[in-house]
């Protein structure tokens, strides 16, 4: 996840001096569509925070000086969720990305079964039905 201040700018300027930004390329190619990543890498042009958000490079834009606070707010919100479920989800997200579409759906179905059988799923559904906060496993 990424939070940027409204005045933030992003670029891969190496091409201006005869260097291709190959290490930033790895992150860009995994977080943006090919066309957006290639445009940034081949032009070296600066993009504003609003364009970065439109492209999917950042999740949120906040007022100057509040990016860290907003990032902590997001982290705090995530920390209220089941640690086991977050771990299952993160693992599945990254593992399926390397699979064929068919294999990814098969894998995701297995992950869903694994998740549904987990104690925290039972606790979360029970808490929802009983209108109380869940007590996640630690």
Regions found by a protein language model. Give the residues of each.
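Acidic, divalent-metal-coordinating active-site segment for phosphoryl/phosphodiester hydrolysis
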Residues: 44-51
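Terminal low-complexity tails and localization/encapsulation signals of metabolic enzymes
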Residues: 126-138
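Structural motif
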Residues: 55-56, 131
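C-terminal long alpha-helix characteristic of the crotonase
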Residues: 3-8, 58-106, 113, 119, ...
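Interdomain hinge/lid region at the active-site interface
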Residues: 117-121, 127
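Hydrophobic alpha-helical segments typical of transmembrane helices
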Residues: 24-27, 36, 88, 108-112, ...
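Terminal peptide-recognition signature
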Residues: 28, 52, 89, 128
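CoA-thioester-processing core
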Residues: 1-40, 55, 70
């Amino acid at each position: 996840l990424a939070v940027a201040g409204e005045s933030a700018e992003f670029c891969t300027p190496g091409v201006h001096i005869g260097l291709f930004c190959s290490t930033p390329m790895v992150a860009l190619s995994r977080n943006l569509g090919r066309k957006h990543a290639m445009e940034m890498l081949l032009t070296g042009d600066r993009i504003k925070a609003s364009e970065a958000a439109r492209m999917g490079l950042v999740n949120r834009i906040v007022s100057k000086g509040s990016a860290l606070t907003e990032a902590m707010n997001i982290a705090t919100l995530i920390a209220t969720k089941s640690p086991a479920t977050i771990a299952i989800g993160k693992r599945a997200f990254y593992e399926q990305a390397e699979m064929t579409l068919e294999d990814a759906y098969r894998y995701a179905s297995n992950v869903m079964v694994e998740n549904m059988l987990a104690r925290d799923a039972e606790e979360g559904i029970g808490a929802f039905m009983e209108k109380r906060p869940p007590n996640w496993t630690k």
